[in-house]
């Protein structure tokens, strides 16, 4: 349980730090620097990447994978994926409304209307892609042989989504880090819970 606890503590530290002048100044400096490196072709690439963390993309993806699990009589795992995604979305919404951090205002390339901390797309990506990787490795033998690579791919996708949020001007770096910490926290909780259920069934 040390990983979820560490991630939760990291999130709490970030939530407090974003109200300090030093962190806010650093966030703004990075966001301004991101604007300076923009290129038309990169704008399109980052806009495409950011959709990988959108709920409108991830929910159908989870439903499709969940349907496949149901077909192969892995109903519990499919339901667990939906449950963790729902928890992810609810937790993010509640925290944004509670913390009420205003988004950066440095020529954003996409429109967002909710509050900024923690980043929802980053939280989605850091939670959902590792969870998908976990269940794919669990049920597909040919992927279980390449477990490390599957998790690396999931991690790379999450990191790219986080970078895209800063590049597009809709989040500060600390928003992304906050989203990552909570997303990974949920992943480790789901993984640990599923492994305990598995051990219980084997008794």
UniProtKB/Swiss-Prot annotation:
> Where in the chain is the site Stabilizes the active site histidine for nucleophilic attack?
175
Q: Which CDD domains match?
A: PAP2_like_2
Report residue spans for region: Phosphatase sequence motif II.
118-121
Spans within the Extracellular topological domain: 18-55, 100-119, 168-172
Keywords (alphabetical) are: Cell membrane, Hydrolase, Membrane, Transmembrane, Transmembrane helix
- Give GO terms: molecular function aspect only: phosphatidylglycerophosphatase activity
Q: Where is the active site?
A: 121 (proton donors), 171 (nucleophile)
Q: Annotated region Phosphatase sequence motif I: where?
A: 96-104
Specify the enzyme's EC class, one word.
hydrolase
SMART domains from the entry?
Answer: acidPPc
- Chief place where the protein resides: membrane
User: Which Pfam families is this protein grouped with?
Assistant: PAP2
Q: Which InterPro entries match?
A: P_Acid_Pase_2/haloperoxi_sf, P_Acid_Pase_2/haloperoxidase
Catalytic activity annotated for this protein? a 1,2-diacyl-sn-glycero-3-phospho-(1'-sn-glycero-3'-phosphate) + H2O = a 1,2-diacyl-sn-glycero-3-phospho-(1'-sn-glycerol) + phosphate
- The segments labelled Phosphatase sequence motif III in the record are 164-175
Q: Which residues lie on this side of the membrane: Cytoplasmic?
A: 1, 75-78, 140-146, 197-203
Q: What is the annotated role of this protein in its UniProt record?
A: Catalyzes the dephosphorylation of phosphatidylglycerophosphate (PGP) to phosphatidylglycerol. Also has undecaprenyl pyrophosphate phosphatase activity, required for the biosynthesis of the lipid carrier undecaprenyl phosphate.
What family name appears in the similarity comment?
Belongs to the PA-phosphatase related phosphoesterase family.
> Per its record, how is this protein called by name?
Phosphatidylglycerophosphatase B
Higher taxonomy: Bacteria, Bacillati, Bacillota, Bacilli, Bacillales
Gene field: pgpB
């Amino acid at each position: 349980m040390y990983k979820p606890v560490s991630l939760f503590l990291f999130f709490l530290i970030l939530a407090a730090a974003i109200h300090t002048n030093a962190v806010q100044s650093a966030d703004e400096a990075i966001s301004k620097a991101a604007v300076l490196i923009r290129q038309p072709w990169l704008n399109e690439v980052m806009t495409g990447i950011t959709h990988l963390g959108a709920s409108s993309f991830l929910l159908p993806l989870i439903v499709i994978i969940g349907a496949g699990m149901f077909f192969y009589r892995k109903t519990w795992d499919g339901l667990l994926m939906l449950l963790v995604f729902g928890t992810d979305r609810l937790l993010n919404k509640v925290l944004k409304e509670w913390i009420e951090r205003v988004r950066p205002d440095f020529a954003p390339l996409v429109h967002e209307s909710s509050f900024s901390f923690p980043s929802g797309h980053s939280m989605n990506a850091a939670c959902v892609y590792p969870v998908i990787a976990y269940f794919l490795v669990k049920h597909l033998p040919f992927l279980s042989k390449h477990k490390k690579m599957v998790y690396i791919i999931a991690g790379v996708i999450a990191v790219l989504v986080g970078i895209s949020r800063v590049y597009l001007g809709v989040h500060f770096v600390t928003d992304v880090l906050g989203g990552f910490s909570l997303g990974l926290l949920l992943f480790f909780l789901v993984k640990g819970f599923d492994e305990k259920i598995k051990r219980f069934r084997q008794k």
